[in-house]
Amino acid sequence: DEVESITLMDAFLPGVGDWTKVWLLRDLWHFHFYGDTPLKLVQGRERIYFEHFWNDFAADPKHSVPEADRQFYARTYGQPGRMAAGFEYFHAFPQDAEDFAGFAKTPLKMPMLVLAGERASGAFLIEQAKLVATNVNSVTMKGSGHWLMEEAPDATMTELVRFINASAQ
């Protein structure tokens, strides 16, 4: 009763369906990149680390994360403790998988919007959502990679507003 609707945007749900197919993909090595050694390797090189994701996870790197945002993220994550906190997000995936697998036993009934980049998670997240919810609205963002708000801002906002307005009725 506390959650009226939920939106998932280009990711995956640990512990749901065949999630390890994504978790173990070689190109997604960063899911397993945490601890002291990775922190030391990235320290002072945050921009280099993030450039890989901003460019390689985009359908077109020229329409990915804008330069001002790149500078902000690199500067912010370069502050003490920030990168370690970011790495912990992925370090928690095994616990998330255990938790989500338990939650998935009771399907969500509220409206769920799933936005997936055509050149990123695509149908995978949509199929996962259908395993955990009974009222799934899904849109594959044509020509977009992982960075939906940067690569397809108008289409993404249109879908979000449409969904929120429909859910509010």
Predicted feature locations:
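Catalytic histidine-centered segment of alpha/beta-hydrolase-like enzymes
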Residues: S144-P153, M157
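Flexible "cap/lid" subdomain of the alpha/beta-hydrolase fold that forms the substrate-access gate
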Residues: E2-T140, M149, V161-Q169
